[in-house]
Amino acid sequence: EGFNIELAKQKERARASRVSNQSMNNQNEEYLNFKLKSTFIGYETLDASSQVIAIFKDGKQAESAKGVIQLVLDTTPFYAEMGGQIGDQGKLTIDGMNFDVINTMKLPNGQHLHIVDMKQTNIQVGDRVLVSVNYEFRKAICQNHSATHLLNEALRKVLGGHVLQQGSQVTNENLRFDFNHYENLTTKQILEIEKMVRDVIVQDYPVCIS
């Protein structure tokens, strides 16, 4: 009974997360109608000199703004939140002053939306900025992302090919992997799955993007 209660709670959390992101994108006409092109370069570099092509404040476009705002850049190395994986964090520099990029999300038409705390400094459309992804933060997310693939494979080998991913959450601190199975895992199965994943990790195989 306790297992079923926790399973129901997890399903509700996953549903709420999907609804939250979908509602932000699908219910805001400003986001839906924004069509300017933005290029992601985050697989080649973690730093860029970029131009601000749009500013959103409280869900509405603005020519200039300060405080916690959302920026779209013509080019960006920041990976956006998607598929249960959190977005990049980092720094934005303008006129020698540094500001925190606290999250990155994706707009309905594919552009990456940077949530930046500009404090009391005003920023305008057309401004040139330097942006830099937090390498350690990105690295930790990548490691947990890779771990979800290892876990998926181990689950299928131990439990059977019927196991399918039903959802996941990947952060810089941990991961959650949701899967279908017809009964609770035994202690023996859990230990076997953990060993399979750890055995691959200690091999320290190179990970390549193709």
List the model feature ranges, each with a label.
Residues 1-210:
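A glycine- and charged-residue-rich anion-binding loop/surface
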